[in-house]
C-alpha cells in the first residue's frame, strides 16, 4: 500500500484526508498529545483495521475524537453536568471522558464495553478533518502496539508507512504524553490514566477524584480494561527498562553506582555529567515536568536505534504532570521499579 502524505492544512488536503476516513481508510492524525491512528469510529470494519495495523488486543478500547462538546450528546447517554463543565474548561485539550455509549457507537470501538471515551483534541488540523468527515474519529496512539508513542511524523513513518492510506504532518506534539482519562460513570469520578492534564486540575473542578489501581500497576489476566493503557505493557523500547525513583540526586547516584556495562541512561539534565561515555537521553530538568512529558517517548524510542543491553531511567515525583511521566516510564519498565 502506498501511503499519501499531507503537509499543508489547505482546504483540499483537509477534504482529501476526510475522504480517507469516510471511505473506511486509516489516517495518521496530529494532536497536541501524540500522533493518532484514526478511522471512522462508527465503521466496524475500519475500526478493526486499527487493531490489525497496530497489533492491538481487541479488548483494549479506543477513544473517539470529536470537534467540540456539542457532539457529546450524539454518542453518549445521560451526559452529566460535570462532563460539560470539564469540556468548557479543558476542551479542546488533553482530557478524555468516559461516559455511557449510545448504540450508534459499535462495541468493537469500545472494546466490548457499554462506555466510550471521548475527547476533543487541541489541534486545528485534526478538528478540521473530523468536521469535514462529519464522523467521530477513533484513534489510539499511532505506534505499533507496545512501542513508545509517536510524537512526530518521523515516528509515524517508522511504524506505519505502507500500512495505512494517509498521514497528516502537523508538526511535533506540544504535550508529548497521551490524554488524561477520567471515568465519570463512577462516584466519585475515577482517574484511569494520568496524562497531559494534571490530576490537580481535575480536582479543582470535580472535587476528590479516585485514582484507579491500574495507574500504579498492570491489570491482571481476566481483568477488562476500561480505558487504553490499563492492561497491557505499553510504551516499551526493545531493551528492558529499570526505573529508579526517589530524590533526584539519590536516584542519579544509585544509577551511577549500579549501571551495568552496555546499559543506557535516561536522566535529568543536571545529572548527565555523572555518565561520561554512556548512551544518555536527557529527560529535561528535574523541576520541569512539562519538558519531561515532551521528551519521555522520544527518549524511549531513540534507544531502539542504539546498541544498549538495558536502560536505567530516573523518574520524577508524581506532582502535576510528573504523575503521567512516571506512569509512562513505569509501564515501559513493566513496573520494574527500584525505590531509593
Where in this protein do the model-derived segments appear?
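Active-site-adjacent structural elements in enzyme catalytic cores
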Residues: 1-340
Amino acid at each position: 500500500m502506498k501511503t499519501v502524505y499531507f503537509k499543508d492544512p489547505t482546504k483540499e488536503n483537509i477534504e482529501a484526508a476526510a475522504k480517507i476516513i469516510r471511505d473506511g481508510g486509516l489516517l495518521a492524525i496530529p494532536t497536541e498529545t501524540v500522533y493518532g491512528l484514526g478511522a471512522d469510529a462508527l465503521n466496524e470494519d475500519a475500526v478493526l483495521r486499527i487493531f490489525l495495523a497496530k497489533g492491538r488486543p481487541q479488548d483494549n478500547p479506543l477513544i473517539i475524537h470529536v470537534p467540540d462538546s456539542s457532539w457529546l450528546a450524539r454518542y453518549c447517554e445521560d451526559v452529566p453536568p460535570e462532563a460539560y463543565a470539564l469540556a468548557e474548561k479543558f476542551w479542546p485539550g488533553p482530557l478524555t471522558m468516559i461516559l455511557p455509549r449510545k448504540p450508534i457507537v459499535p462495541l468493537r470501538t469500545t472494546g466490548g464495553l457499554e462506555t466510550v471515551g471521548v475527547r476533543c483534541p487541541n489541534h486545528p488540523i485534526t478538528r478540521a478533518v473530523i468536521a469535514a468527515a462529519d464522523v467521530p474519529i477513533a484513534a489510539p496512539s499511532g505506534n505499533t502496539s507496545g512501542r513508545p508513542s509517536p510524537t512526530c511524523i518521523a515516528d509515524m513513518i517508522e511504524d506505519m508507512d505502507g500500512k495505512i492510506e494517509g498521514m497528516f504532518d502537523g508538526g511535533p506534539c506540544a504535550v508529548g504524553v497521551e490524554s488524561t482519562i477520567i471515568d465519570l460513570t463512577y462516584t466519585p469520578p475515577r482517574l484511569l490514566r494520568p496524562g497531559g492534564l494534571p490530576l490537580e486540575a481535575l480536582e479543582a473542578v470535580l472535587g476528590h477524584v479516585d485514582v484507579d489501581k491500574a495507574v500504579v500497576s498492570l491489570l491482571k489476566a481476566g481483568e477488562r480494561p476500561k480505558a487504553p493503557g490499563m492492561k497491557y505493557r505499553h510504551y516499551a523500547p526493545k531493551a528492558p527498562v529499570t526505573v529508579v525513583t526517589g530524590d533526584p540526586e539519590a536516584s542519579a547516584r544509585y544509577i551511577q553506582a549500579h549501571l551495568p556495562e552496555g546499559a543506557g541512561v535516561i536522566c535529568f539534565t543536571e545529572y548527565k555529567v555523572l555518565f561520561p561515555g554512556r548512551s544518555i537521553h536527557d529527560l529535561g530538568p528535574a523541576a520541569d515536568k512539562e519538558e519531561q512529558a515532551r521528551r519521555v517517548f522520544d527518549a524511549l524510542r531513540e534507544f531502539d536505534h542504539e546498541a544498549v543491553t538495558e536502560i536505567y531511567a530516573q523518574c520524577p515525583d508524581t506532582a502535576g504532570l510528573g504523575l503521567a511521566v512516571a506512569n509512562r516510564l513505569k509501564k515501559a519498565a513493566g513496573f520494574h521499579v527500584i525505590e531509593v
